[in-house]
């Protein structure tokens, strides 16, 4: 538990310091740090609580060798607007020979590292599509 708590503290400090990278419809944070990878899903949730842009889903992307693990979170407000991260993570990851899925409010994916930028752009477009077609 001590290592996890220390990792969480480090993760919170990291997102407070770095903030999130903003796209039109999503925001994301990225790391290759081993300790931050262990707590990335929780850090995504904390990012929402710490006041990252609340009307944009947040993705935590963690590089692991040739893969990127993605953890995504959103708010009830975004779900009411039509966002379903489980569908987005599933469909977007399959476009890049990855895998993913989950729930409307929290989902994940694993994708090839060399497709990370394309994946982020597709997720951004898919969020816009879901909102505009709700």
Give, region by region, the residue ranges found by the protein language model:
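Oxyanion-binding "anion nests"
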Residues: 1-22
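Glycine-rich, acidic loop segments that terminate in or are immediately followed by a histidine
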Residues: 20-134
């Amino acid at each position: 538990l001590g290592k996890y708590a220390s990792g969480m503290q480090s993760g919170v400090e990291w997102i407070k310091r770095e903030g999130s990278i903003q796209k039109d419809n999503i925001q994301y944070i990225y790391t290759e740090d081993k300790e931050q990878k262990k707590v990335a899903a929780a850090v995504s949730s904390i990012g929402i609580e710490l006041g990252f842009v609340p009307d944009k889903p947040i993705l935590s992307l963690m590089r692991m060798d040739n893969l990127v693990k993605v953890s995504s979170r959103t708010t009830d407000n975004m779900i009411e607007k039509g966002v379903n991260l489980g569908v987005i993570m599933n469909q977007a990851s399959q476009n890049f020979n990855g895998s993913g899925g989950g729930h409307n409010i929290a989902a994940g994916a694993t994708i090839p590292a060399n497709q990370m930028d394309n994946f982020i752009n597709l997720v951004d477009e898919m969020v816009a599509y879901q909102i505009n077609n709700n």
